[in-house]
Amino acid sequence: MSEEYITVGKVVNTQGIQGEVRIIPTTDFPERFVKNDKISVLLRGQRRDYTIERVWEHKQFIIIKFSEIPDMTAAEKLKGGLLQVTMEELVPLPEGNYYIFQIVGLKVVDENEQELGTVAQVLQTGANDVYVVKRSEGKDILIPAIKSVVKEINITEGKMKVELLEGLI
């Protein structure tokens, strides 16, 4: 059985001449990038583990120096690579909080169990997330990820129950 990997960042460029790379994090936990930790990089269908030698934040980027990457030429080859961790390596979330990959694909039903569609995307707006629900017919529904609307999320059953506010459909 192959392990399932979750993307936590993307290599977008090099930084300096000593083999550092710029990462755009796709995690809410940039502190997960820790010296001496190993992390997988998926590039052109190949996954390889690297050891984090140094890590720091710079503007909206995380800068990482991998032990195995000696210079800028080697770092160039990592551009476009996805930093990934296994499910077991994910930072545990507090109860009632979910990773985006857990939300996307959930069936959405209203308080009467009427199916509304499937979560296709999560928009991160700053104030609160918004779930984009694809319907089999008609326009997408935008559902704010707030407790007064989202009444229940059941990852095991693959279902989200919502109480629609007037005007959402």
Curated annotation (Swiss-Prot):
Coiled coil: none annotated. Transmembrane segments: none annotated. It is found in: Cytoplasm. InterPro entries: PRC_barrel-like_sf, PRC_RimM, RimM, RimM_N, RimM_N_sf, Transl_B-barrel_sf. Its main location: cytoplasm. One of its GO terms (biological process) is ribosomal small subunit biogenesis. Pfam families: PRC_RimM (PF24986), RimM (PF01782). Residues 95-168 form the PRC barrel domain. GO terms for molecular function: ribosome binding. It comes from the Bacteria. Keywords: Chaperone, Cytoplasm, Ribosome biogenesis, rRNA processing. One of its GO terms (cellular component) is ribosome. Binds ribosomal protein uS19. An accessory protein needed during the final step in the assembly of 30S ribosomal subunit, possibly for assembly of the head region. Essential for efficient processing of 16S rRNA. May be needed both before and after RbfA during the maturation of 16S rRNA. It has affinity for free ribosomal 30S subunits but not for 70S ribosomes. Belongs to the RimM family. The PRC barrel domain binds ribosomal protein uS19. PANTHER family: RIBOSOME MATURATION FACTOR RIMM. This is Ribosome maturation factor RimM. The gene is rimM.
